[in-house]
Amino acid sequence: MAAAKITFWGAAGQVTGSMHLLEAAGARILLDAGLFQGKRKESAELNREVPFDARRIDGVVLSHAHIDHAGRLPLLVNRGFHGPIHATAATRDLCAVMLADSAHIQEKDFEYLQRHDRAGPESEPLYTMRDAARTQELIVGVPYRRLQHLRKNVTLEFTDAGHILGSASVDLRITEGTPHRLVFSGDIGRTGLPIIRDPNPPAGPVDTLIIESTYAEREHETVLGAEERLGEIIRRVASRGGKVLVPAFAVGRTQELVYALNELFRNGKIPRIPVYIDSPLAIEATTVFRLHPDIFDQTERLVESDSPLFDFSLVNYTRDVEDSKKLNTLRGPAVIIAASGMVEAGRILHHIKNHGDDHRNCILFVGFQGEHTLGRRIQEGDETVRIFGEERTIRAEIETISGYSAHADRNELRSWVRRIGGPIRRAFCVHGEESALAAMAEILKSEGVPEVHVPRHGESFDLV
């Protein structure tokens, strides 16, 4: 291979903001372009930074639609990027929902600040709905396991990452000069979860591996154990007249929870209490899920049993603001599932503000809570938090179920590496907090990878 290098512009030394720039075979290819989340001032500054000329990027390869992987794509378009964005068809369809929602929220927040004379340059939207629409026009749907030529000497193949609908691991082969194979794991999912197929890594020798590390130091409970705990928590909270408030990612986690609640109800393991999906984005995303049953894990069984995947008698989808507001004064037991998953935005903030001070209620975390997020602070026991500028006391019970995580744990990450099968010459650990990155590096070294790096933000490496 002729001179080539990789530069890590996001999810390097932290979880969010995934973006890696590959320069090889005369091309400049981005792997992901995600938003940073967490410390608000720091994240806002990083999100406005485009540390290269977007007009000179030849293309983007997108692993999946989560906003910390796709959320800066419209910003690149705003800054002059006009090349193709390669993603699976399901990721393309989810991006139509996710990116428009991201732009809409930014525009509405800015309008609110303008009305209250609090708007400054730092509060201007990163991009607009028009930028999101222009971005959507650039996305090319690529089927799993189909070879796609990005350039004369660069090919792409997607394999199932098992993280969310449409998620992919990226297999790039560079044939200019000495052949070089680069594999980017994307976010690796769990094995044995319903709906989404299990992770299926690219097989064979790898020259360069870029691998996520989110839960490299932890072990999750089993899926069966998670379902049993979910049922037990709902029964306990309902028996005292309380509500279960679940912050959940609109794409992936919400659909899995609805599926699990359906199973629990059908098997008589939870009482007949209402379940509210209070997330317009989740409702739109669920529509996209219904468009892609061909990539579900359990399609055949579900069709045979005539089981509705995302609908059952207890579920209520709240589509407008007025229906959502009615939940603020809701009496009696209920389950309320709302975005955002890390309690940084969305309708879950209203529900915790209105119901978080009642000891009968429970705030149930079922997904990763990033450093410095409101979700992490509540999860770790902060009794007083600020929501919409007001101090609020948290008296609700706090519970966490790790079995619904969409990220592989340390054993599943090790298994994924082993299933590659061939030797791995070099690896980079990304998408993790410091302790998780160190743990992932140790896993790779113990599996015989001779060269392992934990890159810092903006750090470049030659690939030779």
Show where each model-derived region lies.
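Active-site neighborhood of phospho(di)ester-bond hydrolases with catalytic His/Asp-centered motifs
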Residues: 31-33, 57-66, 73, 85-88, ...
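Gly/Ser/Thr-rich loops at beta-strand to alpha-helix junctions
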Residues: 13, 66-68, 164-165, 249-256, ...
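Cap/insert and terminal regions of metallo-dependent hydrolase folds
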Residues: 169, 189-278, 362-367, 385-451
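Hard-cation-handling environments
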Residues: 231-372, 386
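Metallo-beta-lactamase
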Residues: 102-164, 293-331
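Pre-active-site segment of Zn-dependent metallo-hydrolases
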Residues: 12-17, 24-137, 188-199, 226, ...
